[in-house]
Each structure stands twice: as structure tokens, then as C-alpha cells.
Amino acid sequence: PVVHCLFCSIVDGSSASNIVYDDDHCLAFMDILPMTPGHCLVIPKRHVRDIFELDDDDAAHVMQACRSVANIVHDRLEPLGINLVNNNGAAADQSQFHFHIHLIPRYGRDRLLHPWERSYGNPDQIRSIAEILRGEREIPRPE
């Protein structure tokens, strides 16, 4: 069954959006729930659910589009910085299941806060996880 995708309908023009960037592979449009003024979403035109379905070509095109949109936002809105945010899966707060990157201009003293408290990790645990990621050891599983 074909599931309706809002972002695909923006790509094909059947849903209205405030498009700010358009090339052969990607589209960027204003987020209707902006965290800050100028908050855009950058998407591949081809439907891809998340980063795990994203191929190398789409990944390269999306990052190039992010860079282009970031330069436009930087030049025209003059933010102090820009965050690129990508959520993959419901547990990571993905709400639209078409791969997208939030491009969020930062102006200082805005309402977007980093909700995590940063502290140094356990060096042994960090080293152990790195070994797992490099394929040097297996994830310990209960027997």
C-alpha cells in the first residue's frame, strides 16, 4: 500500500509550501513549526524514509543543498550560527518519515536549548564501544 507522504506531495507540487531552494535532487522549504526565524527543512526529492535508506548520492546532494541553504540563510538573515539536525526513527523524534535535515538559524538567546547535560564519559566504556564499532569485538549479550 502507498502511504501518503507530505514531503513527497510538496515535491510534486500537490501540497503548498514556502520553497526556498530547488535543484534536480533536493528541495528546501520553510518549517511550519519553526524553532527560530528561517528554520528550513532540506530533503531529497526521492522518497527515502531515513538515513538507513539514504544512498551515497542522495547523501552527497542533501549535504550540498544544506551548504547552499546555509549560505543563503547566513547572507540574508545574518544569524550568529546554524544547527543542522536530523532525527531517524520514532525513538529519535522523527515525525515525518521522509529523510530531512532541519537547518536552524541561531540568533543567541533563542528558545532552542540543548536539552542534554554534557559530562565526560567513562574512558573504558568509550574505548569498549569504539572497539565494537570498529568490529574488533562483539556486543556483550546476556546468556
Q: Where would I find each of the regions flagged by the language model?
A:
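HIT superfamily nucleotide-processing domains
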Residues: 1-143
